[in-house]
Structures are given as C-alpha cells and as structure tokens.
A protein has these predicted regions:
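Basic, polyanion-binding surface patches
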Residues: 1-171
C-alpha cells in the first residue's frame, strides 16, 4: 500500500508517494518510512523535523502515481493538482481532507540503508474517519464495505482492495 507523505518547512510544502513504510512499535507509537535523500520532501522533513502520512481511497490512485513521479522542487503540487488539506493540529503539516486515516509525526531517528534513508518518527496525532472503521474483537479495522483501498502492484499499476476482494480469517 502506498501512502502520501506531506511535509512543510517555513513557506514550502510538498506531497510525495511512499511505498516503503511500517509500524515499528506501540509504546510509544513509532512508525518508519523510507525516503530518498534526493527527494525534496526529505529536505523539508529533515529541516522541520515533522511530517504527515495520509492513507487515501482508490479514487486517488492516479494522484498517488502523479505526485510520486514529479518533484516539488519545480512546482507546488498542492496547487498544481488541486489537493485540499488542513494544517495539522500539533505540527502544522498538511493533512489531506480526503484521507480516511492520517498521522502527524515528529522525527526521532534517521539511518541510511543504501539508496534510501529510513526515517523513524513518533506519532503525535492520529486522524481517522470514524465512519470508515469498525471494531472486531477489540481491534479497530477498516470497514471494507465503506472503503476501497489502492494497492500498488508496480510499474504504475494499482489494484483495488474492497469488500468484494477475497478475505479469509485463519483463526
């Protein structure tokens, strides 16, 4: 699953796609994302120490592809592609209005692993469209009857994960 990384430093902001990301720990909630040092977003994130991660529905797959293949050094992607956002509550990073789930992060560590820098960060704020989630056995899970999630297959190809996708419970 590809997420949209949003960043802001001083009067500059940017949005980019990231396919390498994961939860690292829960107490406190730590999340990591791999970024190329050459990316404009990397500069903004390292200078501000903050950024956002946004999960968007499948109707944004084309936007994910576009913002992931164009640099913010040459254009304001928010203006160019009419991307609506609010300023984050705690860290003032862009949080997409159409995100069904989003985080605001404070950078706590960064390490180089070849072509990418793995940036670990502490979650400062969580945004969730409550209507798009359900509780199952004490776990909050996406309600796939209300969501269609884009899954990146590679080479600009996306699939849709939704309620009609095969799902199995192996418990």
């Amino acid at each position: 699953m590809v997420v949209l990384v949003t960043s802001k430093h001083e009067d500059k902001h940017n949005i980019m796609a990231a396919g390498f990301h994961t939860t690292i720990g829960y107490a406190p909630l730590i999340y990591g994302v791999s970024l190329r040092k050459e990316a404009f977003s990397y500069d903004l994130i390292m200078n501000s120490g903050n950024f956002g991660i946004n999960f968007v529905p499948v109707n944004y797959a084309e936007l994910i592809q576009i913002v992931g293949t164009r640099t913010g050094r040459e254009m304001d992607k928010f203006s160019e592609y009419n991307i609506e956002y609010d300023h984050g509550i705690n860290l003032n990073v862009p949080i997409l209005k159409e995100a069904y789930f989003a985080y605001e992060f404070k950078v706590i560590d960064s390490r180089n692993y070849g072509s990418h820098e793995f940036v670990a960060r502490e979650v400062m704020t969580i945004y969730k469209d409550e209507d798009k989630f359900i509780e199952i056995d004490g776990w909050t899970m996406p309600d796939m009857n209300k969501l269609e999630v884009p899954l990146y297959l590679g080479r600009s190809v996306y699939a849709t994960f939704n309620a009609s996708s095969e799902q199995k419970d192996y418990v």
